[in-house]
Regions:
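C-terminal motif of bacterial Sec signal peptides marking the signal peptidase cleavage site
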Residues: 20-23
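Bacterial lipoprotein signal-peptidase II cleavage site
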Residues: 25-33
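Beta-alpha junction/loop-to-helix N-cap segments that form part of ligand/metal-binding clefts
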Residues: 26, 66, 81-89, 96-176, ...
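Extracytoplasmic "Venus flytrap"
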Residues: 59-91, 113-118, 141, 211-219, ...
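Hydrophobic alpha-helical segments within soluble ligand-binding/sensing domains
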Residues: 120, 184-209, 220, 248-250, ...
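Extracytoplasmic ligand/sensor domains, especially the bilobed periplasmic-binding protein
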Residues: 132-244, 288-315
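Extracellular/periplasmic periplasmic-binding protein-like sensory domains
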Residues: 280-361, 368-374, 453
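Segments of small-molecule ligand-sensing domains
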Residues: 342-351, 367-445
Length: 474
């Protein structure tokens, strides 16, 4: 079920369920408030909310304790090549925007717990038990292994609040409420697989091979691609599932050559994907390769090189696009691109994880101010309130914050879309396919058919089946 969304653009409305995400480890969990790696004072302590006027929950008026924001980070494991970039994405909106005038007067202090070695469940526990995190960033594809622990923690503490950039493997009907306050910036992984098939069909591909590494989010997206292909009428010649982080995929490239598909749908990390394509090109193949959002990371082209691009029919990724026509983008883009330690190290503002992380963190902070509290009970409904009409439309953190403090309702219009979320806490984004140019640069995004995407995602979306005690299977 979809919450009401304003009609700033018909495409955004149609894409309420057509959501895209990539599935996505501790180098020492030092607190940071500036560039990644900087240290500050001791971690914040959790402050119990009180009830203010009008029934809103508010923090104690004299509280200036820092708020511990703990990122579930990727410094080891399959996603290690871009772990530092993902951390910069979290630090940027906090250091450069939010902490200039933090919500409720409490500065945010960041910690980064590597999940690549110890696992996501242990990293999340460390955030809560050692750092007293009031905000945990990016619960992700390992959530099912510790959901019971989190539900108990939320029930006992009414905390933490959870904006997530990598939560697309979590079913769309989980989240978005005080008892499970997860809000996802980029959508659902099954829509990513579907989008790849939609693009393949749009270029006339009648047959595909689906290649996926054995990571939950990639497996989910690959399964969705199979279902979407069946719904559309595209023939899946084979699905090839392989372990992640292998030094070579030459045998798989040879099998793809023997199958001779019109296109290959790839659900794998940037390095594995580039290795496969490079080895396929060396074997003489020329195909359309349709990947996932991680390909935007520099490691993809760094591993692939530019020579294979010219030899292939097409190389690009199905993802989502940004809205560069609003004041929100006019503020964000130059700030990212010109601030040392961000654009100069991790690529331009147009890279997907940069702008999607920025948007969800800004909306998180605005919802805290609007709620008057860091409690999940107050924050979860506030995430809807600050992004949905009615309210004064606003585009930047400072502008929106001033309106909230003046007692006005706001309607935040961000850079990923209208700021609206489904009842399950999934952001509405605009699906697209983005090609690579011959020099390795990113080309112009192709927006996919919104109505067709909506029809298909309703057929293939994964939902959790839950009992009366909120024990869920998926």
């Amino acid at each position: 079920m979809q919450r009401h969304m304003r009609k700033i653009a018909p495409l955004a409305v149609l894409l309420a369920f057509a959501l895209v995400a990539a599935a996505c480890g501790d180098d020492g969990a030092e607190p940071t408030t500036a560039a990644p790696g900087a240290t500050t004072a001791a971690p914040a302590v959790t402050v119990a909310p009180t009830t203010g006027g009008g029934g809103a929950t508010t923090e104690p008026p004299m509280s200036t304790e820092p708020v511990a924001v703990c990122e579930l980070a990727y410094y080891t494991g399959e996603f290690a090549p871009y772990g530092s970039s993902l951390t910069a994405d979290v630090v940027f909106p906090i250091a450069e925007v939010i902490n200039q005038d933090p919500p409720l007067g409490r500065p945010w202090e960041t910690y980064h717990e590597d999940l690549g070695t110890v696992g996501e469940a242990q990293a999340a526990r460390t955030c809560l038990e050692q750092h007293n995190a009031e905000i945990v960033v990016s619960i992700a594809h390992g959530y099912r292994t510790y959901r019971d622990f989190m539900l108990e923690w939320w029930a006992e503490n009414d905390s933490p609040i959870v904006p997530s950039v990598h939560g697309g493997a979590i079913p769309g009907n989980l989240g978005g409420k005080a008892t499970e306050p997860i809000f996802r910036a980029q959508g659902l992984d099954e829509a990513l697989g579907m989008s790849g098939i939609l693009y393949a069909d749009s270029i006339g591909a009648e047959s595909v091979v689906i290649f996926a590494t054995q990571v939950e989010g990639f497996q989910l997206a690959a399964g969705a691609a199979e279902k979407a292909a069946e719904a559309i009428g595209v023939d899946v010649l084979a699905r090839i599932d392989v372990p992640a982080e292998q030094p070579s995929y030459r045998a798989e490239a040879q099998r793809i050559a023997e199958l001779a598909p019109d296109a290959v749908i790839v659900q794998a990390g940037s390095v594995e994907s580039a290795t496969l394509i490079k080895q396929a090109a060396e074997a003489g193949l020329s195909l359309d390769w349709i990947g996932e959002t991680g390909w935007i990371q520099p490691e993809f082209i760094g591993t692939l090189g530019t020579d294979p691009i010219a030899s292939q029919k097409g190389i690009g990724f199905a993802a989502f696009s940004y809205n560069d026509t609003t004041p929100a983008w006019d503020f964000y883009e130059p700030l990212w691109d010109t601030t040392a330690g961000y654009g100069d190290l991790y690529g331009p503002a147009t890279d997907l994880y940069h702008f999607s992380t920025y948007d969800v963190m800004i909306q998180t902070a605005l919802a805290v101010e609007y709620a008057g509290s860091y409690s999940a009970t107050a924050w979860a409904p506030a995430m809807f309130a600050v992004g949905d009409p009615p309210g004064t439309m606003c585009y930047t953190y400072a502008e929106c914050l001033a309106l909230i403090r003046a007692g006005e309702d706001i309607d935040y219009e961000g850079i990923t879309g209208p700021g609206s979320y489904t009842d399950g806490g999934v952001n509405a984004v605009v699906q697209s396919y983005t090609p690579f140019n011959a020099d390795g640069s990113v080309g112009e995004a192709v927006v996919l058919d919104a109505q067709r995407a909506l029809d298909i995602i309703e057929q293939i979306a994964v939902e959790a089946t839950c009992d009366a005690d909120n024990q869920c299977d998926w």
